[in-house]
């Protein structure tokens, strides 16, 4: 299984084969794709530019470069069209099994 993204404007599908077993999780309007590595219990993520076919790095590196903050391991589920809000998930193992912890990035509340 490989990550795939369907462009509703051009009606074309881009299959990303760079990462082996992976899933397409989210893509922005400007073609930045967020890929979950693995197929059952995604534990990490990659960021990929669909327009240029370029690997933009791990989720953590991309978030640090774009927002200047450190996030836990994981992958991005959603980014708002304006880029101000990001939702992500991190897998965490324990004696009870694997839990999936959600995290987010949002601007500070107005005072």
Task: Tell me what each language-model feature is.
Residues 1-111:
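Conserved "turn/edge" positions that cap or connect secondary-structure elements
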